[in-house]
Amino acid sequence: MTLIPASTCRLSGEPLVGADTLFEIADCPLPGIYPAAVEESLLLRTPLRVVQARESGFVQLAHVFDSNLYQQYSFAGGNSRAYRGHLESFAADIERTFLKSTSILEVGCGDGWLVRRLRETGFTDLLGIDPSRAAREQAENQLVSGYFPDDLPASHRHRKFDLVISRHVLEHIENPRPFMAALAAALAPGGQLWLEVPDLNSTLDRNLWSNFYQLHCNYFSALTLDQMAATAGLRCVAGSVVDVFGGSLLRKYVSGAAPALPVPPRLHEVGGRIKAFSAQLSRLARQVPAGTAGYGAAERTAVTLGFAPELAGALAGLYDGNALLAGRYLAGTRLPILGKEALFGRTPPCLLIFAISNAAEILDEWHVRLPGDMLVGVVGGNFPLQPLKAFR
């Protein structure tokens, strides 16, 4: 796959001159695509290089990707109890804040869960748009298959909404400034924009290095997300960090001038910390017995194996709770994906949890259904391989 170097800072729009490389993986699995054939899987590898712009301090991917990849992209991380609980909480927040007559646009609606949930609770003026296959299959549920704003139906192209929602989309956008401007332009007078993105500071504080991957072009802190919103004439009126994907920002914006904001600090120590993480994974690969399997096949599993390719070679396969992934391969590897129930029929000698943000939920089920003497490790965790019963 041919990559084009990014030429501008995605926050300031200025030329990306003299950016500092935070880290680089020369050959990394490409997350979020699940091929049916191993030959196709092995082609899905690209470089991964993350830089920090010197003038603005913004952290971003150093390359440009073809947006057509998103037609193949499958978000695989939404099956946990914690994530579903967060979606319910998000919907409840909307119900508390807005009247049922509120006009709502969700940009990046995925399979339309939130649109359907809000309709079930009495909201009637709803529209979702997403380029994924899931949106195409749900067209009858007020979902549009395509890219915002160009693929909105003519009847909605210049429409204004009381609430615009975009969850875990902005980090994927190659040119976020015009995208943010389009979100702001879709707001009715007095309307609100609710944004949710992975939180860079949570990633750094918790050493969640697999939050960096090729289809995340942009890495926002609360500061830089507010700066991006300010380029579109928006100011933040409320914000929090929510406990999904290791910590995500949920911030709410209205039209208005934002206060002056400082330049983010330099992140000089990241490269050394990532080298230590890679060394930890390499040691783990040498420790696991033959027949070891992994649990969790979402995007972060693929990039974790990019940090330590020998760990991929030490695994016999992966299990995942998303039944739609069964029978496919983790991109960039030879690792087949099996459904969760298959795990309980032929228990491997050792299991490594890659879905670390859901580790507690996974372990709760394993305590009931798997032998207590089976070896378990949490990839990137702070404890070594140990029997399952030791995790109580």
What is the predicted role of each segment?
Residues 27, 195-218, 222-224, 228:
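Short, glycine-/aromatic-enriched active-site segment of Class I SAM-dependent methyltransferases
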Residues 43-134, 208, 213, 218, ...:
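Extended interfacial segments that mediate partner engagement and assembly in macromolecular machines
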Residues 93-94, 250-392:
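Hydrophobic, well-ordered beta-alpha structural blocks that scaffold small-molecule cofactor pockets
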Residues 140-153:
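Conserved SAM-binding strand-loop segment of SAM-dependent methyltransferases
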Residues 190-198, 375-378:
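Conserved beta-strand signature within the Rossmann-like core of class I S-adenosyl-L-methionine
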